[in-house]
Amino acid sequence: SLWGTPRLPCSPGWQGATKRLLVRSVSGASNHQPNSNTGRYRDTVLLPQTSFPMKLLGRQQPDKELEIQQKCGFSELYSWQRERKVKTEFCLHDGPPYANGDPHVGHALNKILKDIANRFHMMSGSKVHFVPGWDCHGLPIEIKVLSELGREAQNLSAMEIREKARSFAKAAIEKQKSAFIRWGIMADWNNCYYTFDGKYEAKQLRTFYQMYDKGLVYRSYKPVFWSPSSRTALAEAELEYNPEHVSRSIYVKFPLLKPSPKLASLIDGSSPVSFLVWTTQPWTIPANEAVCYMPESKYAVVKCSKSGDLYVLAADKVETVASTLETAFETISTFSGVDLENGTCSHPLIPDKASPLLPANHVTMAKGTGLVHTAPAHGMEDYGVASQHNLPMDCLVDEDGVFTDVAGPELQNKAVLEEGTDVVIKMLQTAKNLLKEEKLVHSYPYDWRTKKPVVIRASKQWFINIADIKIAAKELLKKVKFIPGSALNGMVEMMDRRPYWCISRQRVWGVPIPVFHHKTKDEYLINSQTIEHIVKLVEQHGSDVWWTLPPEQLLPKEVLSEVGGPDALEYVPGQDILDIWFDSGTSWSHVLPGPDQRADLYLEGKDQLGGWFQSSLLTSVATRKKAPYKTVIVHGFTLGEKGEKMSKSLGNVIHPDVVVNGGQDQSKEPPYGADVLRWWVADSNVFTEVAIGPSVLNAARDDISKLRNTLRFLLGNVADFNPETDSIPVNDMYVIDQYMLHLLQDLANKITELYKQYDFGKVVRLLRTFYTRELSHFYFSIIKDRLYCEKENDPRRRSCQTALVEILDVIVRSFAPILPHLAEEVFQHIPYIKEPKSVFRTGWISTSSIWKKPGLEEAVESVCAMRDSFLGSIPGKNAAEYKVIIVIEPGLLFEIIEMLQSEETSSTSQLNELMMASESTLLAQEPRELTADVIELKGKFLINLEGGDIREESSYKVIVMPTTKEKCPRCWKYTAESSDTLCPRCAEVVSGK
C-alpha cells in the first residue's frame, strides 16, 4: 500500500541515522484549512468534536481543580495505592515544616517537588510511603506566643505557656495542611506525624537514652552560642549571620610581665614592652586568661616612633598594624613564635594578674596582630586552649547578656553588647592600654527568630560528642547519592566546622531532657529504669507530665529501689528541653517503615545541609550505624523574579493562596490555580535559587494554555475513533505517522529517565518542545487535510488517528505528575474511555518496541529539507497554490523518496502531503521544457544508514511553479479543474456518503 512499510534498499534490521530531525515550523507559508464555514460542503467535513474547553477563564480554573479533586478521588488516592499488591516500595521522608505561620512559596516549592516524585513512582508501579509531618516545638513558637500576650506573659506558668504554644502550633498546622491538600499533594493525611505527639516524643527519648548509654551524651560547662534576647543556648543551625553588623574593634596592649628566655635576650629593659592584641569583642577582655601565638610563625620586636615603646606582634603584620595605628614601627629583631614559650604578660585591666603566652593552632595571620586574646568562657577555640592548659573558665555574663558581680562593680548589670562595651573601652583608656578603637562592619551571628545578636558564653549544657560519629557519618555519606553532587561537600564542610552539638535549651516548649538533678550537689540521675518509666508516661500522656506530675510520680520509689538508688525527694526534674533539631532529627525512628528504616529520598532546601539532613544523619549513625536516607535532593530558596529577596517592604512577597485563588483585585492578581504553581516549580532550576513573580506565573499559564490547545486538538480528532476496532497496524500506517510514533517512543524513554533522575525542569522543556514544535507546528498542520477531508473510515485517516491516540496517552501521562488536575480533566474527556478511572490508577507510559524505526528519519528529514527550500522560496504565500517537481539522481535518496510516492505525479501521495503543495512530481532527471516563471532550488542530502556503514550524498533539485488547478470548494486545496467543482478526492468522498 501507499502508506506501507518503507521499502528500504538494505537488509532487514537496518539502523538509520543517529542524528535527530530538526523539525521546522511550516508557518513560513500560508496553509489554509477548511473550517466550519465551507459553504454547501460544510456537513461533509469531519471537524474536531470535543467538550474539552480551550481556556478556563477567571475563577473557572481553581473551581475546575476543586471539582476534579472531588470527582477523581484525590483524597482516596494515597490509601488506594498503599493497598495495591505490588513488590516495590518508594519511601520519601517528609522533613517537617515548622508549625509557625501561613503557608508560603517555599512550602509550595518543597511540597510540590515531593509530590511530583511521589506521583511518578506511584504511576511507575511502586507503593509510595509519604507521611507528612510538622516540627511543633521550639523557641520561635514560644516567642510568638509570649509576644502576642505582652505583659500578661510574665505571670504565666510553664504549663500555661505550653498550652498556648500547642494551640498556636495546631492552628498553623491546619492552615498549612489545607493549603498542601489544595495544591494536590498526595499523602497519608490521616496519619501525619507531629513532634508534640506523645508517641513521637517517647521514641525521641529512647533515642536520647541510647546515645547517652553509648557515652555520646554528656553534661559540661562549655562556651555555647547564647541569645540574651531569648535567654537560651542556640545551635549553629539556629543562627543567621547579619553581614551589616557593626562591632567596635580595638587594639590593646598587654604589658610584658615575665619574658621568655629568648625574648629577654632581645630587649634591653630601657623601654616598656607590650604584646599587641586586636579583638572585635571588647566586652570579653575582662574574662581574659591568656594570649595565644602561632608557634611556627615569625614574630618581631618593634619600636613605635610615636611613643618609643617596644611592641611584640607577628612579623607579617608589622606594616599593616603600623599603618592602622598611624605610626611607624622600627623592627628591632625577629624570632620564631616557639620562642615565646613560658612568657607571661599582665592583664590589661588587672595589672597584677598574669596572662600566660600559649601556643595555639587557631591563631591566623589573616587579621589582627598574630596574637590572640583568649577568654575561655567566651570562645570555642579559647575553651580548647583552656582545657589543654587548665586555665580558669569563669563566665562573667549572665542569661540576660549582662555582666555579673564577678566582673566587678564598674561592669555589674551592664549589657555586654551595649553599655558594657563602652565601660570596658573606657577602663582600657584609663589603664593606658588602649591604642585604637574603630568601627568594623562584618558578618555576625544573630538569633534566627528575635533577629538580635548573640554572644558566646560558657554555661552548663548537655552536649552530643560528635567527633566519633562524624568519622562514621562521613564514611556512610559516600554511599548516599546527592543531587546536586556539590551538596555533599557542603554538608561535610558544615559537619567539620561543628566541634560538638549543644542539645539543651533553657525554655519550656519542647521535650524535656529526662534527667533529675540533686537538690544540693552538682549530681544528676538518669538510668535505664528511670528512662523506661518516663518513656511510658510520655507515650500515654505526652511530655506535659514532666511539668504536671509531682517528682515522686516521675521518679517513684520502686524505680529507684531497682538500682538501689537514693531517696527520690533528694532529686528534682531538670529544667532544660531538647534542641528542636534533635526533635526533628529523630523523625526517622518514628516514621520510616520496616526493619531497615531507611528512606529512598530526603528532599529539602539547602539550609537543611546544616539542619535536618545533618541531625537525622548524626542520630541515626549514633544509634544504628547507618544513614537514614539513600538519596538526598537539595533545592534552592525562592526569590522575587528579579532575583531579590522577598520582603514586605519591597512589596514582592508572593502568597501561594493568592496565586491559586487570586487576590482582592483579580485584574492584577488573577486566580492561576494550583497547576500553574506546580508547573512553575517543575519548570524552575530548583537546584539554584528559584524566582517567582507575575511574569514567571504568566509564562507558566501561557505554557499550560498552549498545552491545552494541543490536547483539545488531540481529543477533538479522535471523537469518532475506537482504538480497539479502528486502529491501523503500525507497519501499515503512513510513514509520517510511523515517524511520529518513533519520536514518541524516544520522548517517552527520555522523560521516564529524567523523572528517575528528578530532573523535572528537563521534563518540562522536553515536553514543551514536543507539543509546540513537533506537534502543533509540524505534524498537526500536515495531517489536518487527512483528518478533516478523507472518508471517516478511510485507512489513511485512521492511520493518523491511531498515532493521535498514542500521542495523547503518552503526553497526558508525561505531565500527569506535574499537572494532576489537567491530566484528570483530559482523562474525563477521552471519548473512547466510557467509564474513566483516574489517570493515576492506570499506570505509567506504555510504548511498543515496534514504534522504534530510526531509518524513517532519513525519509522524513530529506523531504523536510526539500519542503523547507520550497516554502522559503514563496514567503507569505499559500503552498497549495504551487506544484513542485523534485528531481533526484538515481540512487539511495531517490529510492527512499520513491516509497512516499509510487506514481510520477500525485496530489494525494505521502510525499505531497509532506510538501503541502498542489501536486508533487518525482523524477530521476530534469524535464526538458520548463516555463520561464519557475523557481529552481538546488540542494544536497547525506544519507546515513546502518550506524554510518552506509553513507551516500545525493543532489536534488526542487522546481517550483504556480499550479494551473483551481481551489476545491470542500478541501481548499488547489486540486480541482474549476472553482465550482470538487477535486477528484473530494468528489469520491462526497459521492460515497
Curated annotation (Swiss-Prot):
One of its GO terms (biological process) is isoleucyl-tRNA aminoacylation. ATP binds at K645, K648. One of its GO terms (molecular function) is ATP binding. Keywords: Acetylation, Aminoacyl-tRNA synthetase, ATP-binding, Ligase, Mitochondrion, Nucleotide-binding, Protein biosynthesis, Transit peptide. It catalyses: tRNA(Ile) + L-isoleucine + ATP = L-isoleucyl-tRNA(Ile) + AMP + diphosphate. The keyword Mitochondrion applies. The modification N6-acetyllysine is found at K55, K170, K214, K222, K706, K756, K762. One of its GO terms (cellular component) is mitochondrial matrix. The keyword Chaperone does not apply. It is found in: Mitochondrion matrix. CDD domains: Anticodon_Ia_Ile_BEm (cd07960). The modification N6-succinyllysine is found at K55, K175, K222, K460, K481, K756, K762. A motif ('KMSKS' region) lies at residues 645-649. A motif ('HIGH' region) lies at residues 97-107. HAMAP family: Ile_tRNA_synth_type1. Aminoacyl-tRNA synthetase that catalyzes the specific attachment of isoleucine to its cognate tRNA (tRNA(Ile)). Belongs to the class-I aminoacyl-tRNA synthetase family. This is Isoleucine--tRNA ligase, mitochondrial. It comes from Macaca fascicularis (Crab-eating macaque). The gene is IARS2.
